[in-house]
Amino acid sequence: MTMSSYLINSNYIEPSFPPCDEYQQSGYIPNHGDYYERPKDTGFPHHSEPSYPRSNYTESGYDYGNVPTTGLEDFNDGHHAQPQPVPQSHGPRLSAAPDGGAGAIASKDCSIASEVYPGVAKGKEPVVYPWMKKVHATNITAGYNGGVPKRSRTAYTRQQALELEKEFHFNRYLTRRRRVEIAHTMCLSERQVKIWFQNRRMKWKKEHKLPNTKIRSSSSASSSASGAQQHQQQQQQLQIKSGQQLVPTPSAVSL
């Protein structure tokens, strides 16, 4: 009960008991010294003198200077050893981060990256070559259900169209080498230059009312076949006529 009340109320005063001379004489309790009141400042008003007279026991003051330090030194050596200096590494030196927070740390990381990679220039955009550009953009309409996306028509600029027209004026057919040069100069692909010249030749033939080469070749082949058939028929007719003339008539044989 005493312990529970002491835990609940921290201001509990431990009771003081008088010297038990009677108990000592009877031998019930051994002589362990006189009890004395526990000095504790509780804030409550109490009597200046204890309720019971104290014995002549004088409490010796605790001298902190006379404490043996051998055990403490061993304890400090084992548990509170001073941290060893950290060896410096060969990498970039990092200083303690100021109170700036994450911004200062990020700026230091950027400076470290610039020191490690000095060749990389800041703010320089990568060079995009013509062959790296995407030529055809795949624009899929909402109603298109096909598996392969349709190609969008290439929109030639005014300068590109003018240069292609100049080249077509001098040469309607391009060699492979010339096509590569034009494509590299105008930032186009070889396929774009080839298709443009094919379409331009068809337009030129329509303007000059010239037949298509494919249609003309097929018509000439059919006409040659029909002419060969007519020639064979004429030869057969001539052979028939000549045979009729050589055969004698029955009137001439009777005479």
Swiss-Prot record:
Organism, as annotated: Takifugu rubripes
Full protein name: Homeobox protein Hox-A4a
Claim: Phosphoprotein is one of the keywords in the record: no
GO biological process, one term: embryonic skeletal system morphogenesis
Domain of life according to the entry: Eukaryota
Keyword field contains Cell division: no
Taxon lineage: Eukaryota, Metazoa, Chordata, Craniata, Vertebrata
Gene Ontology MF: a single term: RNA polymerase II cis-regulatory region sequence-specific DNA binding
UniProt KW keywords: Developmental protein, DNA-binding, Homeobox, Nucleus, Transcription, Transcription regulation
Matching InterPro entries: Antp_homeobox_Deformed_sf, HD, HD_metazoa, Homeobox_antennapedia, Homeobox_Antennapedia_CS, Homeobox_CS, Homeodomain-like_sf
Region described as Disordered: 28-102, 207-255
Polar residues biased stretches: 246-255
